[in-house]
């Protein structure tokens, strides 16, 4: 990407923004809904009743979309913390006895939209998927695979893995047409770069084949669910690049939601990315990451310089 300007950095930045909105982002010239994301409000510890209350208060404030973050996955390994459940993508009926369908109905009743968090590229050791397919995980032979955030990385160079992820997301979105927003998370890097799928002479292809598998999944989902907004989240802005963003509408700028620190992040990112691409949320004071207190007006001012949301 090259921008030319005779009038300094500001004009070059605005030219990149115009290009990005037209060509570099999905839906770059469409309006974004304001949203309430559940994460910092409840983390993993929520019930259906608690979520209904959050949705009601969001609707009363005029917020247009409610996003259920991590903690909704169930099955044999319910996800009540970060150590279990990733990869299984079944609803935790102990927390949500009426399933996602019940939450979607409640959102529709309140006149707001519904979104969901997923992390399809990851798997916990405590999951049905890992127990059935340990060979689907990226790792080096004859070495203990290293956990990060209690999870392993699935091998997207393997077409069977990509097919599993695609089928799981099709089931989630196709079975719940009321889902209008997906927060696609990715909370760890490749730390043990070996593929059980690739031949020895092709091990160096892993990073490229991984990205190609990821792109094929997102391209397919975008074609099959064109009205669903996709956010790229990677422990914050780990995927804030134009190679990724033409498959996503926006990115989560940082897991650090301190408004003061976000000023500098958003200023820097704003040189290359338009405001519509940066998710920025009003969060609690004191802030959960830094402990810093800030006025509600200041937190709003900072969040409104991106795509406005709330936690």
Question: What are the functions of these language-model segments?
Answer:
Residues 29-167, 176, 181:
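Aromatic-lined carbohydrate-binding/catalytic grooves of carbohydrate-active enzymes
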Residues 80-86, 196-198, 303:
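Active-site His/acidic residue clusters
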Residues 1-7:
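Short Pro-Gly-centered flexible turn/kink motifs
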Residues 24-25, 56, 172, 221:
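Short, flexible, glycine/charge-rich loop motifs used to bind or transfer phosphoryl groups or to couple energy/partner
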Residues 92-99, 106-109, 131-297, 305-310:
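Active-site neighborhood of glycoside hydrolase catalytic domains
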Residues 13:
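An acidic, glycine-/histidine-flanked metal-binding catalytic module
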Residues 7, 42-46, 72-79, 121-127, ...:
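Flexible loop/turn segments at secondary-structure boundaries
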Residues 16-29, 34:
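Long, charged amphipathic helices and adjacent flexible linkers at domain junctions
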